[in-house]
Amino acid sequence: MECKSDIYGGTNQLLPNATHAEQHIHYHNGDGEHGAAPAATPPHPHTLVILGAGVDAAVGLPTSAQLIPSIVDWLETEEGKAIDEALRKQLRRLSFRFDKFVDDAIDRLAKDLDRERDTICRNVREELERNIHLDESQRKMGSLIVRIFQKITEVKNGAAIDEETEELIREVTGMDPTDNTIIDFTKLNYTDTFKNIITHILRSSLHDSDNPILRHVYKNLLDIEQLLVQYFYGFFTGRQPQIKTYLYISWVLWAYLVHCEQENNDNVNPNVNDDVNLRSVYGQLRGKDDIQVVTFNYTTFAAQASPSALYFNGTLTEYVDIENKNDLHFDDIHSLDLRTFFTERLPQELSLTGERIAIPVPSFMPPMKLKTVISEHYINVWYRTSEAIRHASRILILGHSIQADERFFSDMVRNNRDAEIILIDRDLDTACHNLCCTLQLSPNRYTSLVLHGCPARKYDNRITVVQADLSTTDLTPWLTS
């Protein structure tokens, strides 16, 4: 029997009309129950804290840029192999492999640079111009990338038939040119030297994803969100191969993140370790009941530190059967045996053929590029987030580089024109550039200062970007009124 997914309806399901004004907003009371939104707006905290991937990275988890290479390595472990085998047993004839995806991405970009070349070249050039903290090796790598890519662009531009040349061709030969260039670049082969240089750069970016230069190559190479977007469309087209691939990618991502949280929980949770680092971001948020936390991370660390934390993109503790409209929950992912879950529990819940169809997927936010694909659960979270941002007098952003293309969330922050905004990040230049683009400010109009021993820049008399390491930074000055 062909799998035809019913993706509409249900408490935590995908709703096609979710953006309509008549959509009902439901509040979550913290006990797993939903209720109608109260008539009066609930009180809001003075300070709002927004957590990004940099906060989890500070306690040992991979950054978003490191995610796919880390998953590839983990799938080579005994645990990873067992989970991969269990999933493939359920998802028959699955062809997707993370390691092959990485190799194909490198080969594809090395052979055909037209799609990404100009974007990478522009971003690297901007990094070279504005980042005064690059060391000599980073500047040389950046210069090499720009020079190599520019030479390709120059050759292509030089071969173009401009208007003057086109007119001369008509006058001399009486013919109208039918091509735009004098070279067929589809048949042009790069030399082995060039291919080896590009492959070296791409391979280097896999293992040095935080490099200020190489990250511009890397983010155009491997992007877990783009990967999920690519296969999420299968739920709309009814294509089983795409559905199976999405199930595999999302469950492997979930399993790897649970594995990482289990390994690092002792560093974060004082209930299991008395010597936990209370100076970590999560340690410093504990007991701050007057502060609202919004996290973009999937781990439970935010909820451990602040039970009222809002999970903007989803959480590891929830998953959903999108076919039968059932919300499912993990009581304790720290004691969860991943192998047992994938060999015993998930096979009972997942069914793609026969009379019973059931499609459980991790409760990750459906990719934002699919703007009409949102659920009632997320509308609730986003509404509460929007209200918290709107009423906050101080917004503290930690480890999250807000970018202009994140329009949905960026608009929430931009619309509060009175709040004091503090962003703390290791990369001052990039953080300033991204935040200024988001808030429509000039990145060069700032006052340079030192706050609590850290370099900082102040914009618009209310926005401060601080360069600091979140694993050691004392947040007390910003967490107190």
What is the role of each PLM region?
Residues 34-104, 112, 377-481:
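SIR2/sirtuin-family catalytic core signature
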Residues 11, 18, 316, 401-402, ...:
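A broadly conserved detector of short glycine/acidic/proline-rich loop/turn motifs that flank catalytic sites
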Residues 88-368, 373:
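Extended, H/D-rich, highly charged conserved domains that either
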Residues 15, 310-312, 397:
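Short hydrophobic-aromatic micro-motifs
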Residues 12, 22, 137, 368-370, ...:
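Intrinsically disordered, low-complexity regions enriched in polar/acidic and amide residues
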Residues 1-39:
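Long, low-complexity intrinsically disordered regions enriched in small/polar
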Residues 3-5, 121, 260, 432, ...:
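Generic recognition of cysteine residues
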